[in-house]
Every structure is written in structure tokens, then in C-alpha cells.
A protein has these predicted regions:
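Peripheral interaction segments used for macromolecular assembly
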Residues: 1-101
Length: 101
């Protein structure tokens, strides 16, 4: 029942706001939300993309399996996705289903 964290684990609360880069190491956005499935496992991350200083940003959903988490040379968490800025700009905008509780 009791749990001890493992060295390679991350706290979900610390993922919000984490920078997201593409494979060319271009910053493409940041993490706005984390979506859990019915079993409590991470299904997707909602990324804020395309904005500047919080203006004009839109949200897209990216499956958790398509994201990679690594540490930079300073030990900071960086999330990466194999996508171009153009493909993310063309991604459908995420909208929460407001009928769900």
C-alpha cells in the first residue's frame, strides 16, 4: 500500500508549464494540462502552442506515447515530440467536452 518514489519518476504537478520541443530542438509550446484515462494513467498532454507571451496560444492534445521526457544539461525536464511546428499548427484544437464532469 505504501509507496516510495523512484529516481526516474516525475511529479505531475511539475509537468505543467514544462517546455516542449521538437526533434530539431525548437521550442513549440508548453504543457497546459494532463489527461488521465479511466484507469488513472496518463493518456495525453494538452500543449499550448503558437502563442507569444500567452497571447494567441491554442491548445492541442498529444498522446502520451508520442512524447519523450529527458533532462537537459542543467538537469531540467524537457519534453519532446516528433513533429514540426507546421504539423502542430495544423493539429485540431483541443476542447474539453463540457458535458462531462
Amino acid at each position: 500500500m505504501w509507496y516510495s518514489h523512484q529516481p526516474d519518476e516525475n511529479r505531475a504537478s511539475k509537468l505543467i508549464g514544462t517546455k516542449v520541443v521538437n526533434t530539431a530542438n525548437e521550442t513549440i509550446g508548453d504543457v497546459n494540462e494532463i489527461v488521465l484515462n479511466k484507469d488513472g494513467k496518463v493518456a495525453a498532454m494538452i500543449l499550448g502552442v503558437g502563442g507569444f507571451l500567452g497571447m494567441g496560444e491554442r491548445e492541442i492534445a498529444v498522446s502520451f506515447e508520442s512524447l519523450r521526457m529527458n533532462r537537459d544539461s542543467n538537469g531540467n525536464l524537457v519534453i519532446s515530440v516528433n513533429a514540426t511546428k507546421d504539423s502542430l499548427a495544423a493539429a485540431p484544437q483541443w476542447r474539453w467536452d463540457t458535458t462531462r464532469k
